[in-house]
Amino acid sequence: MRRVTSVYVWLTVVVKDNTIIATAIPRITDQFKALEDVGWYGSSYLLVTCMFQLIFGKLYGYFPIKWVFLAAIIIFEIGSAVCGAAPTSDAFILEMVVSTYLPEPFDHVLSAGSFYINLPIGAVVIVVLLQFLHVPNTVPVEASSKTLFQHMDPLGVVTFLPAIVCLLLALQWGGTTFPWANGRIIALFVLAGVLLIAFLAIQRKRQDNAMVPPRIITMHPVAFSSLFMTLFAGAYFTIIYYLPIWFQAIKNASAVNSGIMCLPLMLSMVIFSFVAGGGVTATGNPVPFFYIATVLAAAGAGLMTTFEVHTGHPKWIGYQVLLGSGVGMGIQLPIIAVQAVLPAADIPVGTAILTFCQTFGGAIFVSVAQAVFANRLQTGLLRAVPGVSPGLVQEVGATNLDTVIDAQHMGAVKVVYNDALVSAWYLAVALFSVAVLGAVGMSTKRKSA
């Protein structure tokens, strides 16, 4: 029981980082004066997480599980320490990458404290795991260093990561730093496409030794579950990364209070995850819950696009509950569906692929949402408030607008800011809606006993 408890405590730390970053982002943009880097704060964390989900999944097969897990915790702790001490936005993004190797009393220290708090918790977990975590009946596969290196699919890594980085750079710079027709942006999109094609060719050639084995990903239940997970998670992360900004920039909430104001979303997610789990267990068929989840989530996200500067508590609480009920019901369904149809030997790989898709969808679509937000903010300010520099608004961050914008322009700036955030949420509505295609292709056939 103690070893199970220690593992769950550590999982709580990791989950905390997935959500606390979103709440701390407005404060981080103030500290580093880099509103344009919001997309990178989420995408860098999620991108490297999705990559190392698959790599660590393979490492567990070649080395003792306990020591691989402990090594990952130590790397995570180092990343948390350097994130808390990051002096610039660029350094923070780089250090976020380090902290993703594992699958506050005062508002002004929230951004650093969010990461430093991991250190004592991690130290306690390491001590407990050293004492009580015993993994029985695990025999690591013996392999030479050369064989191990090859099985990590290095060619897949060196084609996939640069491809996604090129794509994120194009989305980040397009329309703001450079025009969409600029040669740099076009070159980045072309290079991303070429590298992704190379990655797919490598996966096909390597088969079961690939990062994403074609034999498994092409199975109908896995393919459609992966599609659903990528779109559904992308929509969720798009909401959760920009909702705290809305509370802090539009409602003047502190970072701590904005976290509290997001509780309706989080609590409804928890409750309806149990509802979905119980429903699937009772009926033996996850497909109806896919449809219900997409309808609820799309409806909730759609209602959130009606947010205005003066939207009151009943609406932003109620809409979050509706959205959270759909997300909580749907976010775990792909894993349940895949585990119900895959042979036992393939379940770990299938689960790893879906976890990969979850964070991959977040990495890509948070960056897309940032491109939408930044472009709408810039064009909106130029059109509606010509006396205010878009560059100044982006440099000052999300919560210090009143320090550089005079009172006569503040109302108009908030309206433009609100419209830019809402525009990013339209992307979430579209993703939730299209995710229903995953349910259409889902197999309801359960694996034989």
Swiss-Prot record:
InterPro entries: MFS_trans_sf. Its main location: membrane. SUPFAM superfamilies: MFS general substrate transporter (SSF103473). Glycans are attached at N252. Signal peptide: none annotated. The chain crosses the membrane at residues 6-26, 45-65, 67-87, 115-135, 155-175, 182-202, 227-247, 260-280, 287-307, 321-341, 349-369, 420-440. It is a multi-pass membrane protein. This is MFS acetylaranotin efflux transporter ataA. It comes from Aspergillus terreus (strain NIH 2624 / FGSC A1156). The gene is ataA.
